[in-house]
């Protein structure tokens, strides 16, 4: 298979428990929190501006392993290490439900584009639930090792799951829970998966000795292309809402490619430790990365320039999600909190 990025169809994409103001942080690579003040109501010490306000969403009893926002921006879904699935009404700041799951080891959480379904990577399975009440409708059984990543097709009819342990990609029919196909030939430990916005392809990333990005036809499941081997583990992938760019977390680098011609747009060194996860804002402005240092870095999607570093979490930051307008970022971490970052000032 040739190393290339297949040409994609281009289109225009259609056009925020307990809340406490925690701190202010500022753009600039050297921004840092005031370490001498243990009080959470602090202001970062820096001369840069404008400010980025952050709120704490606390009350969780387990590490935040995955989170996501419904497409309408009304609800936040949170998966925690104590096997709880929690849905929060963001407008009313109320918990809609918090349910204990019989499965654990939550690794990823996807929400369908119509906002009706949750798919949760848990143990060797994928738990499919209704968003509105948390009712489990299907358990997708077939993987023989921990499921690392999960994604809905844009029409919500197909779920793709990947496991770095069993080195398979599995495609499921959402409505019936039936396994459509298993992809296992010549695969490395695949841990991330994302669909293109037009639904024509899904893209996977691998760790281990493989360290390649693979492109798959979402209808025939044919392998369309494989990238050159990357210099580090591919810990996360995201496609911009306009379908033009692929962004990846490769070790501690943020990389972006033009999907039309495979041209690398930028490769930027981020934190000193590995990046855990990556997210692209729906307004095509920002790339957010979270790392093992407990910090979040925001990059300009146009040129890869670092815009700001967000500090405040204690421990690894494991999950990120943007609001639909791209002005708010949600982060979940080992410290059992979700932080809500107001990025609107960055665009001024």
UniProtKB/Swiss-Prot annotation:
WD-type repeats, residues: 59-98, 142-182, 185-226, 229-267, 270-309, 312-347
Presence of keyword Repeat: yes
Keyword terms: Repeat, WD repeat
Keyword Repeat: yes
Transmembrane segments: none
InterPro entries xrefs: Apc4-like_WD40_dom, Quinoprotein_ADH-like_sf, WD40/YVTN_repeat-like_dom_sf, WD40_repeat_CS, WD40_rpt
SUPFAM superfamilies, alphabetized: Quinoprotein alcohol dehydrogenase-like (SSF50998)
Protein name: Uncharacterized WD repeat-containing protein sll1491
